[in-house]
Amino acid sequence: MNNYKIYIAIICLLFAFGCSKKFEAEPLDRITGDLIFDPLDKNADYAKQFLNGTYLLLPDWYNRIDGSFLDAGTDDAVPSRIGTQAEFYRTGRISSTTLPDDVWSKNYLGIRRANLFLSKVDVVPTTAVLKTQFKAEARFLRAYFYFELVKRWGGVPLIGDKVYTINDDINVPRNTLDECYAYIVAELDAIKSSLLPYAITDGDWGRANIGAAMALKSRVLLYAASPLSNPTNNIQKWALAAQAAADVKALGYTLVTDWVANFNATKNTEFIFIKQNVLNTNIEINNGPIGYLQGLGLTSPSQNLVDAFLMLDGKAISDAGSTYDSNNPYLNRDPRLTATIMHNGKNWLGRPVETFEGGQDKPGGNRTQTRTGYYLRKFMGKFETSTTYTNQAHHVILLRYAEILLNHAEALNESGGAVADIVNNLVLIRKRAGILPGSNNLYGLSLTLSKDELRKIIQNERRIELAFEEHRTWDLRRWKLAEIELNKPVRGVQIIKNGTAYSYTYFNAANAVFDTKMYWYPIPQAEILANNKMVQNPGWPN
């Protein structure tokens, strides 16, 4: 293929990414047949590049909603800049025309690209083994894109392998929620053995493998079993979710010992599936405290989240017998607190963070700064004693083993599993975090906990272990707790320095409004207008 053809192929790909209507026929299918899917491309180089481009449509986390994390629309944080679109979620301002997290078109574009790949890759004269693997990867990506749609909107149109053309009828009804879950799971089951194995080479890192398919299945079945999707509490759904998580555990993934370094690794035993990024300092600059270098401090974690972190002995700060000291609130806490959140007095770039009133990181005035008394620390490199930021790996860790352990604990608890098995999953999480083992070697847990007690513990463990990894938004919805937790104010702390001592006053940093119709996103108005069979979600006007 000469340079001119390669150039045209690239233009075609860019055009595909720019298309905004998911069912409208794009000329992509007419111009890629002999350019990207080339009968002379014996190594499948261009087909692989097209597939790689489809991977780029996988989700991002970092500051993606108008400069904020999606979690800044929950009770875990607020955007430091007032009025950013992430606040629409907390204030109830989303609508079918105002949806900052509108990934409908993006995910249907991914589905279309996967279908186009499946329909054309057979003309490429590469090996049957490689074709089988690539087809399985395309189907995995398609399943992932469908789940991104389903967790937001519920049932969506399933279009199978069809690649729509200009002359096709694009009026397609929504499938039911259960049909969508069943389709995704069936696809993952069908292709898992054709994907790369559990152990993959460095050159294939970031590609879907059997672990990714099984881990995504675990997540999908957990959502399908949860109250939002399972209002009758069908225990069999929880049992299926428990088995799916157990199957992933059997593959051999393990937790890494260094919780902080985990998020700047390129490859390790905990990562199951990642979206790769180039080395950069974007997270540090966008979220670092404003008194350092170019720190923009765009994310303000909440007091609500700070209070969720345990004491070092594994007890909640509100537990009877807790050693929590209101005059020294960050002392003897779960190490994940200071690994997730910058609080006053934490060392960073060679000096203590100053979020007291008038401090270097909370100077007052009109400059964007923390609204809660906290800054984000998670995902950053170990710069506590450094003088400057250096490039770090900031891959998007889409699936990791810690989530699987939490999935297993939750599904076992809801399906009537043995308390010891449930607790063992949590012990692994807490032990790695640095919680003390205690006299019973159960890291603040016990084998006499009730189902309801374990449920609360598991939910809180997910909150702190997976903070800012885009789980809180969906967890609160699938548990049907959003109407409770997201109607509470998001709290912050005002710190006054008195000599060498500090006083702490807690306040409401932002109000919150959650209506039950917000459990499911409104379908974008443009999709309703374009498809006369598309039915809007309950409570939302067209």
PLM region spans:
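Membrane-proximal, proline-rich intrinsically disordered regions
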Residues: 19-66, 310-322, 527-542
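Bacterial Sec-dependent N-terminal signal peptides
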Residues: 1-29
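Conserved, well-structured interaction surfaces
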Residues: 41-52, 56-61, 83-153, 169-182, ...
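Hydrophobic, small-residue-rich alpha-helical packing segments that form membrane-like cores
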Residues: 158-261
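Flexible, polar/acidic helix-loop-strand segments at domain edges
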Residues: 325-401
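Long, intrinsically disordered, low-complexity segments
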Residues: 18-20, 93, 97, 107-110, ...
